[in-house]
Design a protein with these regions (language model features):
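Residue-level detector of Asp-centered blade-edge/turn motifs that repeat once per structural unit
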Residues: 37-38, 117-118, 167-168, 209-211
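A structural motif specific to WD40 beta-propellers
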Residues: 11-12, 73, 150, 194, ...
């Protein structure tokens, strides 16, 4: 809709006549659509399927709507693309829709588009395979001039959880979990990945401030969210400055359990990270009952999260040693 001094003019439905929704149900929000810098285009996320296909498929795409012509373009797949048939009675793993030759068509979950500041690119989070909700989220970059797609986080063997463009339109900042901690990383259009922060914590939302600084939220198993300003350094690691202390007056009155890291050899010979949360005032000479925290899904790793549903500190405060693989 056009907004003038006289008010808001009648809006245009970008999905007029189409039985779909944006943002996508059930968890989608405003992050699934974005305006171009010149305000002439809108990139949005949508899963344009119905019936059985809508029920079993995770294949969403990024669409580009032109406000002048009213035309919509799919950035993930070429015009006229028809996906292979899916046998709903069988696993999606070995079906033709997930053949390696299909990966170029972004057959998985594509979401959260962002235009580059210069308007020449659209980047989004992309999963490779259809029907696999826990697939790795990569960062896909679409060149609006030539239609080329590039995956710029292939050197990072984990999910891209949040991201933002740098002001130069040639690089990004993103968060991702590695060894049970979610830190901030930087990558460029060539796919060179460098770690910016380090430590036992999880960074959540990130946004670019002026002069290349980042505004971010951070928490851990011992501290809920606070806001930080991160200044990326030329030597890969950056400066982290805490700017809010919203719960300090409460935390100062609490005795929290210490958090430890263990690596356990699995039955197939691999090393598995396990977080240990000890009860407050832990005494190594005493015996304690153990509580095994079993992650559901699995849709996400057990990282340094602060949960308001499954809080490790509340469990440990009951006198348990919490073991979280």
């Amino acid at each position: 809709a056009e907004v003038t001094a006289d008010g808001i003019k009648e809006g245009k439905d970008m999905l007029e006549g189409e039985p779909y929704e944006c943002p996508m149900e059930p968890f989608g929000g405003i992050e699934q659509l974005t305006w171009s810098p010149d305000s002439k285009q809108v990139a949005y996320t949508c899963r344009k399927k119905t019936g059985r296909d809508y029920a079993i498929s995770t294949d969403s795409d990024i669409y580009l709507y032109d406000t002048t012509s009213g035309k919509t373009r799919n950035l993930c797949k070429p015009a006229g693309f028809v996906a292979p048939e899916v046998d709903a009675t069988k696993s999606m793993k070995n079906q033709s829709i997930n053949d390696k030759s299909m990966m170029q068509y972004n057959m998985g979950y594509d979401t959260n588009p962002q235009f580059s500041p210069d308007g020449k690119y659209v980047a989004w989070q992309s999963m490779a395979r259809d029907g696999y909700e826990s697939d790795r989220n990569r960062l896909c970059v679409f060149n609006l001039a030539n239609g080329e797609k590039t995956y710029v986080t292939e050197k990072f063997d984990s999910n891209v959880d949040a991201f933002c463009w740098n002001s130069d339109s040639k690089s990004f900042f993103f968060t991702g979990v590695w060894h049970g901690c979610e830190n901030i990383y930087r990558t460029n259009l060539a796919g060179d990945v460098h770690q910016i922060t380090e430590g036992w914590h999880d960074y959540g939302s990130i946004a670019l401030l002026d002069k290349g600084k980042l505004l971010a939220t951070r928490h851990s198993m011992t501290v809920p969210d606070d806001i930080y300003v991160v200044t990326p350094g030329n030597d890969k690691k950056g400066k982290e400055e805490q700017v809010t202390f919203e719960n300090k007056h409460i935390l100062d009155q609490l005795a929290l359990g210490s958090v430890q890291q263990r690596w356990v050899k699995t039955t197939d010979g691999k090393e598995m990270l396990v977080w240990i949360v000890l009860p407050p005032h832990f005494d190594a000479n005493k015996k304690y009952p153990t509580l095994l925290f079993c992650e559901g899904g699995p849709q996400s790793p057990v990282s340094q999260f602060w949960s308001y549903r499954w809080n490790m500190q509340i469990m440990a405060a009951q006198g348990y040693i919490v073991v979280a693989p």
